[in-house]
């Protein structure tokens, strides 16, 4: 039996976390290692379903997504903050209180100031570093930003969803593409960290419109992106359209594929994608709130797995197509992504190329943008 090694190949991988492509991992000796810390903040989420929203967008039912169905009292908020702070680990250097689920700057000024004052109290004591919130692009104006300019808000996420006017109209968003462009530009001029939330599979959207939207967002250079698949929530206006047959949601495979293309586009522009897929919850997982659509509790993992499958196929086709068996080595942090959920990628590779076996092995000398394939042949010419 002959064994062959493919020449070293660098593949563009999901997260290089600041490493130079192709650079090997620099690992200290075991007795020199220090506890690893993460640049990502520890998020303390406070959900304010539909707070400040001028109307209901067709896809939205924040109460179902967040599991929060009543207005949050000051005591509720303080209790949640205290509960979450108990779970902070030494790996997270920074802590952020985050207000999600509504249109934060669309709330009355007194409510905005009250909530931010509560959160700022934790910053003042040193237990929390900063505050973030999500809001609509059309709420970004000088008057509203004056409300928060002396408070420790560092990050603002915009519910953009699409950069196509036809899609925005079909989903009844009520804001325009210029609203988003002006909002991002204004926030960046004021040195806020800016995030953009996008959705795949919205009514009126197409693959071409989706990619065009992503390109327009990329040109605005936000700091990070979240990507969510559109699902039909039982309490959303979209549910009626789905029942009448006016709206057909994407399949899971379609949603994963479209999200993959967005991820790779943003990755090529050095824009972080910090989340893909809805946050798993008991309400979503038990199926009582979702009528249809591409919900999966490990949606992001499915996207990463498809990216790794593409990488493996490309390398196999270049140097191991006629092998009987192969071994693929990857950075330890990427082994599960390479295997795919329930070893799905392994089975796909075996079927596609007729391999007797596909072994996956961790290799901490490989950078996060590398795979190495070794092939075995029974016979040699």
How should these model regions be labeled?
Residues 3-38:
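Arg/Gly-rich low-complexity intrinsically disordered repeat tracts
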Residues 65-78, 87, 101-230, 234-254:
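Conserved non-cysteine loop/helix-boundary elements of the Radical SAM core domain that shape
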Residues 89-94, 125-128, 320-323:
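Short helix-terminating capping/connector loops at secondary-structure junctions
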Residues 2-5, 38-42, 237, 244-381:
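Auxiliary Fe-S-binding modules of radical SAM enzymes
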Residues 53-57, 233-239, 284-286:
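Short acidic/His/Gly/Ser-rich catalytic and metal-binding motifs that mark active-site loops
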Residues 95, 129, 154, 223, ...:
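Short acidic/polar active-site loop segments enriched in Thr and Asp
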Residues 48-52, 228-233, 279:
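Short glycine-enriched loops at secondary-structure junctions
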Residues 39-76:
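Canonical Radical SAM [4Fe-4S] cluster-binding loop centered on the CxxxCxxC motif
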